[in-house]
Amino acid sequence: MLLAQVNRDTQGMEFQSVDGDPQQVTLCLTEAVTVADDNIDGMDTVSLQAVTLVDGSTAYIQHSPKVSLTENKIMEGQVIQLEDGSAAYVQHLPMSKTGGEGLRLEDGQAVQLEDGTTAYIHAPKETYDQGGLQAVQLEDGTTAYIQHMPQSNTILAIQADGTVADLQTEGTIDAETISVLEQYSTKMEATECGTGLIGRGDSDGVHMQIVLQGQDCRSPRIQHVGEKAFRCEHEGCGKLYTTAHHLKVHERSHTGDKPYICDHLGCGKKFATGYGLKSHVRTHTGEKPYRCQELNCLKSFKTSGDLQKHTRTHTGEKPFKCPFEGCGRSFTTSNIRKVHIRTHTGERPYYCAEPNCGRAFASATNYKNHMRIHTGEKPYVCTVPGCDKRFTEYSSLYKHHVVHTPCKPYNCNHCGKTYKQISTLAMHKRTAHNDTEPIEEEQEGYFEPPAEAIDDPGLMYTPSVVDDDSGSEQVSGSEIMGQHHVALISQDGTQQVLSQADMQAMGGTITMVTQEGTTITIPAHEAMLSSGGAHSVTMVSADGTEGQVAIVTPDLAAYQTEEGELIQDQEQHEVSTSPHPVTLLATSNGTHIAVQLSDHPSLEEAIRIASRIQQGETPGMDD
């Protein structure tokens, strides 16, 4: 235990070491302890050592700061001649917590520090004044409050072990002890450390810092309430934060330190913050405490941030604007904006290291999804009983969920019609309202992926390049309101409409690679799009086998079987040639079931109806 006594009348200071070998202590007047006493104009830096006299009393030897401490080193057991002629010897004094022997802390104020140590502030209690509290910023960055007493003595004691509760049970703390430990709120003034000089603030009194000899003396920080006074010293950074804690968390982004580890069996992921770990644990527990309050939405999320981003899909709020002049686009999240900005700069910082690949990506999510093409990994599985479909992308899984739900989250702002997929909405707006305004990918928020799986809004599909992240694809052709379209429909249900000009640019055929590695080729000539009697399409498999796929017209039966073994398991192909769209489903046993829909086609609705037909049911067209 270290006891420091300050006598303000004489400016003298006394330190006593009672928990180990006698040690020298230096009082360095700098930053952390604030004492509002305008009568103190200066204070000398001194070094003191406790000695025990032969009669059992204790004396203190003061060393002049102008003399080297090593020249006055006093060892335990050494006999010292005092000024009055008596002899004294240096002796270790044990600290007794139970009273009787040693020093007892009477009438003290307890301060629990962040590093586990306990500080006690003692003063005569007969002049206790609630309004006399002064803020104390400790060396570890914490803030405590002490009461300044106008009497001649104030004692600050720091005990290396023990807690406040220990002393309370022993009856050593007075009932009038002040409760402390508030957050940072004191205004500090920078002073030179180690000079022994006292720095005076504008109105805050004297600033002091107690430094044990041998410790480094750090430059103090200046903090004003509400200001960002903590600066990151990492080269090229310089970000400011309001508290030392926030700065410490930020610095982990430079050091890579992740002290929070998931203890779930087989996981072991690490995180830089406790909040990040807490959010991650919910992926194991399934807890989603943050629920959307929008009527008929029913979505829940693991974090408040995910809920906030999802809510913007209802409100249309896009607070994050692109800073590039002439762009004018805005986004629901800062991360989407960051990825979008790379479409202006051309930056693609994520490179595939696989041999003979060399692809680069603007977002980490697309990079991770691409790498699964090389590894074959499909970690995201549909949990609906009997489905068990797997996907390389988290977002693809959530978009797939519309197959199993009646929800239609995407609505037309012109007529109010609702759709399950944003691609279907886009086609409706182009054909029915001549609205060619692109629909932002970030609006696909109903099944919104978590923050680490946000799709790259800058990822563009081109007519001549098919994104190889999609696994397998299907083709649809439709004639709506006199306009011809061909749509590439990926396995997860997303759809990209191609014009005839796009088709011509692609050449004579459309070749698709399924997730099993087989190839399906479909002719892309104009005759395919004609409504005048083209009721079948030739499909060619990888081994050269050809087969005719029938197109069911409105006056035919609800389904029709056509021979052929070229269709792969669970592949869906949509072909429409009449003003009343028809959807063709290829089942796992090679049976082709065509379902006519009364409204604009939806691949998911067709699959649902066709599945019921395959099971022997005869659902109506409005099912």
Curated annotation (Swiss-Prot):
SMART domains: ZnF_C2H2. SUPFAM superfamilies: beta-beta-alpha zinc fingers. It comes from the Eukaryota. Belongs to the GLI C2H2-type zinc-finger protein family. A zinc finger (C2H2-type) spans 230-254, 260-284, 290-314, 320-344, 350-374, 380-404, 410-433. It comes from Danio rerio (Zebrafish). It is found in: Nucleus. One of its GO terms (biological process) is regulation of transcription by RNA polymerase II. Keywords: Activator, DNA-binding, Metal-binding, Nucleus, Repeat, Transcription, Transcription regulation, Zinc, Zinc-finger. GO terms for cellular component: nucleus. This is Zinc finger protein 143.
